[in-house]
Amino acid sequence: MLKSLKSRRLILKRLVTLLLSLFFSYLIFSASRNVTSSNKLNNHASERTAVESSAFNWIEKRQHQVRSENLMNRLSAYFLPFLSRSSHKERVLLRQLGNNEIAKSDKCRYIFEVLYKIDPDWDNAQTAKFYNVDGVDNTLASLLGERLRSYDYCFLSGQLDPTAIFANSTVNPHDLQNRMFPFLKKINEESKTVMWPIITDMTTGEAVPAPEVDMESSNFNGNFWSNWNRLSKGRGFVLTIAEKDVPLFLKQLKVMEFSKNELPFQIVSTGNELSAESIAKISETAKETEQRVYLVDCSTVLDTNFANTYISFFQNKWVATLFNTFEEYILLDADVVPFVGSDYFFDSPSYRESGILLFKDRVMENEQTFQYCIEMLNEVEPSAQERRFIGSRLVFDSSLPFSSETSEEASVYYNFFKKLRLHHVDSGLVVVNKLEKLNGLLMSFMLNLDGKLQRCVYGDKEIFWLGQLYAGQDYSINPVDGSIIGPVNEEPENDDGHKSGMYYICSTQIAHSDSKNRLLWVNGGLKTCKISNSAEDDFGREPEYFKSRYGDISKLKRIYDASLNVEGLIVPDVSVHPWMQIKECSNYMYCAYATGDGHTNSELDEGRLITFTEKELRYINDISRTWNAN
């Protein structure tokens, strides 16, 4: 009996020894794996480190802390978790995260739980304020980029449902959405109504019913962007217009009728931009021109206080980019005139490849942004920790060498970030696949709301490509510089009697063409001067200048009110002949120059003059007359 008892004790002792050996081996193996993972991170030493309040910075420190704990702490976490600073479950999660062995759902849940743990009061609305302290403004911008990319990684591109991921979590998915996108209407799990704009058919005056959804309203609202994108259908034109833009939009509708357009229009508003009188005028013209026009009132999906405080002027365009119901659309300013059908833009190879097509602005080399803006934007790039944990990558970033000659997009990036050139994109017409580019559009909206970044760019123009860039998306920019159309003039003969060979066009319009010299669209309407009362204002401002050239106000007014006479197009080489701004049309008129052997369509050494066939000129000027018809 005694021998049997001793034998059992010996077996039990050996079993305990074996279990402890296995446990220690596991700890050593785990530590070695984590060291390997840490070494991988150190390979990216040239990349920036996450800011102190970053969720990824906290997670990395937590991993280091767990790895450095002594054996007793590890045993305590396993056998006596209530005495440990970290649970065994968290230790396993951190190890899996470091070795990229974790399920995305668990990773995403942990990332956002950490976000709330670091700062229970975090809110992206903080970026809309300008603190005028670089450390504060830049840190908020950095956190904004990190949070939006994390949200995209998990719930937009990642296609996880936040209402399911956070079902048993300390994070409330509705609260997360409220803080991530402060412009959205504040919702909670008790919401009984599906978030949807009020849409009115302006030709009939009837409301368009909201679609039926196959889920509870709280679930729909708690994963709003994925559900919104899922219900977006078809193609169309999208605008946001103020009262002053209504006469221009009516002209645009008449041009669309002339061009036999068949796509619908959606005018997207925050709720109160248009008067009843303006709505009636649009409705009447829509019926006359047989164009389908819808008014999309977003007051039901926007936070009223935030919208009234921060959404104005250029920010309204982002409301239009996000809250139209199309899958693909062409975003237009009211004074844009297309000369090709919508299929041209949607079938463009560069658009089909990237999902968004932008066009270049005039090249103005003497207008620049600020170095402090570049320093701020560099902080928006993914940190080394973010790259490690969720794999964020950008097409271009400040830590990688690249050639500005590889693409138009690379050239624009180089000229903005290295040369500080301010103007690159004309956002009067943008072609967008919303299903593919939603995360970039959300990034753009939030960047354009940023209190500091608003001081770095002109309006919304550059934010279109910057938003896609920092969302990790690609984008396409038409390679032809912004140009000018109008009557072609030749400089006087030289002193020796020979022709100067220099041609110029002066007008207020920005024209856009393709690599085959085809005129695509114009920004600025087709009136010689679109600025109301400009003749009177010009004479009042510079009486001697305008009297010496035009005699009196009535003559200048007749010139300004005339239809633009199009004879040709010039794409200037600004390194030889920069754009010249002149005093006409309240300083809105520019002149561009090109030299060459007569009116040819060849690419000239010093700028390019494009002339049109008789058929092309007839069509272009018919559109000009249509635009200017009463």
Swiss-Prot record:
Asked whether the UniProt record includes DNA-binding among its keywords, one would answer no
- Between which residues do disulfide bridges form? none
Q: Name one GO cellular component term.
A: Golgi apparatus
Q: Which residues lie on this side of the membrane: Lumenal?
A: 32-630
Its pathway, per UniProt, is: Protein modification; protein glycosylation
Q: Which UniProt keywords apply?
A: Glycoprotein, Glycosyltransferase, Golgi apparatus, Membrane, Signal-anchor, Transferase, Transmembrane, Transmembrane helix
Q: Supply the Pfam families for this chain.
A: Mannosyl_trans3
**What EC class does the entry list?**
transferase
EC numbers on record? 2.4.1.-
Q: Enumerate the Cytoplasmic topological stretches.
A: 1-14
Principal location: Golgi
> TM spans, by residue?
15-31
Task: Kindly list the GO molecular function terms attached to this UniProt entry.
Answer: alpha-1,3-mannosyltransferase activity
Sugar-modified residues: 34, 168
Q: How does it sit in the membrane?
A: Single-pass type II membrane protein
- A Gene Ontology biological process annotation? protein O-linked glycosylation
The subcellular localization recorded is: Golgi apparatus membrane
Q: Which InterPro entries match?
A: Alpha_mannosyltransferase, Nucleotide-diphossugar_trans
Domain of life the protein comes from: Eukaryota
Spell out the PANTHER family in the cross-references. ALPHA-1,3-MANNOSYLTRANSFERASE MNN1-RELATED
Q: In which family does this protein belong, per the annotation?
A: Belongs to the MNN1/MNT family.
Known function: Mannosyltransferase involved in adding the 4th and 5th mannose residues of O-linked glycans.
What further fact does the record state?
Answer: Present with 2310 molecules/cell in log phase SD medium.
Q: What is the protein's name according to its record?
A: Alpha-1,3-mannosyltransferase MNT3
- Report the source organism: Saccharomyces cerevisiae (strain ATCC 204508 / S288c)
Species lineage: Eukaryota, Fungi, Dikarya, Ascomycota, Saccharomycotina
What gene, per UniProt, encodes this protein? MNT3
